[in-house]
Amino acid sequence: MKSFYTLLLASMVSLSVSAQNVDADKVRTAQNKALRDSLSKATEVLAYHPDSIDLRLKKAAWNIQLEQWQYAKDDLDKVLFLNNTNIAGLFYRAFVNEKLLRYNFARLDYQNLLVLVPGNFQAQLGLALLNEKDKHYTEAYDGINSLIEQYPDSAMAYAAR
């Protein structure tokens, strides 16, 4: 009898987890549809305002959320062509280049960002993690140790170590 209840409980838990997975898939599908709708509207508006940096940054953000890395990179390249000191453009292009496995380009973007905003926590952390991913261990550990010295109360800096 005990095994019957155990089996019944296990099947109920399994059904509950399956229902949660189905609900999560429906939510994700709805979110992706909304992002694609926003992306298509932004593309239409960009036809009339091709030099709008804000709109291109939003479009790149939607492409990043949809994991369309190359489209995001193209928009970020245009943003940085229009304004080569755009901090958001440099940071997000570094992230996208990392996703595209273009580590040297990502490293350059992080370094250029740190020239514009020395000591930026996110840029230093991104560069250190990129160096670790690209097997530049000495630079990675130096960067993480520098972060810990600058931000001794940051749990993220310690977690990166």
What does each model-found stretch correspond to?
Residues 19-77, 81:
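N-terminal leader/linker segments that initiate helical-solenoid repeat arrays
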